[in-house]
Amino acid sequence: MRRAAPPARARSSAVPQPDAGRASIEAPDLNEQAEWLLRRNWRAGRLADGTPYGFTCPSPPRYRHQWYWDSCFHAIVWRHFDPARAREELRTLLRAGRLDGFIPHTVFWHDRAGWRRAPFYATQSVRHNLATAHIQTPLLALAWELVAESSPDEPSFATEAVDQLCLHYDWLESERDPDGDGLISIIHPDESGLDDSPKYDEVFGWMRHYLPGYFWLVERSRRLGYDSRAIIGRYDEHVEDVLVNVFYALALRSLARLSGRDRYRERADRTEQALVERCWDERAGMFWDLAGRYERPISVSTWSSLAPLALPSLPEEIGRRIVEEQVLDSRRFATPFGIPSVSLEEPSFRAGWHLFRCWRGPTWVNTGWLLIPAMRRLGYTHESERILASYLELVARHGFREYYNPLNGEGLAARHFGWSTLLVDLVLDRSRLGPCGPSGSSGTSNRVAAS
């Protein structure tokens, strides 16, 4: 049964305060638990050809492979405990890439996909693939810069892979931005990492995640050899995704600093400008994804629409509107526990667990990791600390779960989930004002003008 939108309530700018009597978690305990989890989930070895690997499984046995953005998040936390492992995590991801700069969504290093699941992975053939043929939200250069800052014992790490990183982001521009507007496209819903988000329902229709047609979506890509430009030019099932492009812009800025090459700063400027000019809806006070060849706005309110808060160049008036009208509004994203993945006003909102509905309401830690520092930068210190406290309470109650119910705080889905340890990064580095390094610096970028 579809959940009706909640009745209108008076708008509030207050985030619910966790009860003083509830459990709390101290930073030393949080650190110990996080490090134990990451070490528990670590896998290392060599392929038959001698290629070494070392990475953190998100949550074995279900999530036992290497996923692109999971590994980036894991490395960001590893740097606080074991910078050498953080470096190896990212080097392993880079080793899975092709010579042309493509880096896959999922890599099956030590344990290939089972026969039931294999046909649904976006691979070149149904079986016997080392990796998928699709991308994921491209934050590798951002993670690389953060790990490099925590690697005084190996200063050369910052520049050792600059050429490979440049190839990666050049491939994304060439293959996923055929119209040259600065916004890259995804061609499958799981490429953003938000697999079953309701914002994809209309775009992918019967081919969306976990429906029978999803197999055809994968098979269609196989038949076209995963030629991104051909798929984008021929079909309408592709999206210029706001969240993907926010991380793309942040990573381009990191790459500009790592490489010293101005063209990546200029590309970041263009992407951020495009997000404001093409995706910002002044009336709704939200950023919308753009779907298909005609770039139709997807007017579904998810946390992706809040993600541009993380851009240091975002016009302050837009940032404050997002915080005050969305994040701190109890009708929308202000819930007792964290920031939900979908606005409470959306008919598709589901707070609890469902096998195929993980991005349709529950709270995820990476959301807070991206948005809380942005709120600090805008001066919402008290509000951001209260949201952080609610995330800490979730972990104190239920441990590092895959996601949580934003209304009652119940821990849901996978246990010992790797990227939920991102809370450590927020707690250990409260001075961090953004995801672009300790000070939130955006390099030499110009502030994007509101359109």
Language model: regions and residue ranges:
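Compositionally biased, low-complexity flexible segments
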Residues: 1-11
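Extended glycan-interaction surfaces of carbohydrate-active proteins
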Residues: 16-66, 90-130, 181-239, 272-363, ...
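Alpha-helical scaffold segments in carbohydrate-active enzymes
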Residues: 36-37, 92-99, 146, 164-178, ...
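Alpha-helical support elements that line or immediately flank enzyme active sites
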Residues: 70-101, 304-315, 368-381, 388-391
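Short glycine/serine- and small hydrophobic-enriched flexible loop segments
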Residues: 76-79, 141-150, 250-260, 310-313, ...
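Internal, well-ordered domain-core segments that constitute the primary functional module
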Residues: 136-191
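Long, repeat-rich segments with strong aromatic
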Residues: 237-259, 264-267, 271-274, 313, ...
